[in-house]
Amino acid sequence: MSDSPIDGSPQPEPDYRYKKDELFKRIKVTTFAQLVIQVASLSDQTLEVTAEEIQRLEDSDSATSEADTDIAAKTNGKGSPEEQSPSPVQFINSTGAGDASRSTLQSVISGVGELDVDKGLVKKEEPSGKDKPYPDCPFLLLDVRDRDSYQQCHIVGAYSYPIATLSRTMNPYSNDILEYKNAHGKIIILYDDDERLASQAATTMCERGFENLFMLSGGLKVLAQKFPEGLVTGSLPASCQQALPFGSVRKRPGPKMPALPAENKWRFTPEDLKKIECYLEADQGPANNPSRLNQNNSAGRDLKVPAGRGGQNLPTGCPTSHSNSRTLNSGHLQGKPWK
């Protein structure tokens, strides 16, 4: 592969770094976003993701960009994303067909909205519950970058778990990680900026017996392209911000605004969820996903898909002032409309 294109400008870094025989599985950014919406909407219930549900979510995401499908087609890796984007649950099972014992993304999602009979009644949320992680969340999100990068920017609800922690001789895993390791209906998701660190950490953990582990495909770089707002708190690093398209005129930079540090934020606000849903609509298109959660959202049907995907403004059809019934009405989701 050449180092630079014909015009001599440096060649952009690839968004995905697929390798053959990857030990870990991958979860698409769009699938992760769907899982986030479900978990946030049903946060007052015991959540469990099943492989079948993830498969359905991934299938509903099958209309994602052709570029992603082309990349997946070129890889023989075990963790390559499927051309179909089922539900988050589908995604997990579809990539590892022979592993019946491991917790798949599908298994995690299919149980969303159902009470865990063994655990009895649903836990009542304390007044300060919004400052805490979602109870019984079906996924554990780990940021494997260094602590400074985490404090500058991270996905809402992620825990800081620098990759160097894996090198510890004693106690390399927190209690949360041990609780989620290979637990039924639970998965662990690792991410970084561009898959460099996350792929190493995921490989190491899989070699140490983690069977329900996933890597966020494309990392923050792809996440920033598809979801410029909503999923992240803080200021994205320059390496994750989308470059100008070839031939476009670069505007003279204005005064540089100071980068805002990440908040100690564990839950998504209603505004965050609205933005995530709108970017999902822009990426997939409501007509291509009749089984998606927002199929009955009248505002979503009026959505206008912007020309550019990365770094775009919020789609013009996105509701900004009124409540989104799909996001905030947990009763609607309890019926599992994605089935």
UniProtKB/Swiss-Prot annotation:
The keyword Protein transport applies. It is found in: Cytoplasm, Cytoskeleton, Microtubule organizing center, Centrosome; Cell projection, Cilium; Cytoplasm, Cytoskeleton, Cilium basal body. Residues 82-99, 286-299, 313-332 have a biased composition (Polar residues). The modification Omega-N-methylarginine is found at R309. Keywords: Cell projection, Ciliopathy, Cilium, Cilium biogenesis/degradation, Cytoplasm, Cytoskeleton, Methylation, Phosphoprotein, Protein transport, Transport. Residues 56-99, 283-339 are annotated as: Disordered. GO terms for biological process: cilium assembly; protein polyglutamylation; protein transport. The modification Phosphothreonine is found at T75. Found in a complex with TTLL6. Belongs to the CEP41 family. Required during ciliogenesis for tubulin glutamylation in cilium. Probably acts by participating in the transport of TTLL6, a tubulin polyglutamylase, between the basal body and the cilium. This is Centrosomal protein of 41 kDa. It comes from Rattus norvegicus.
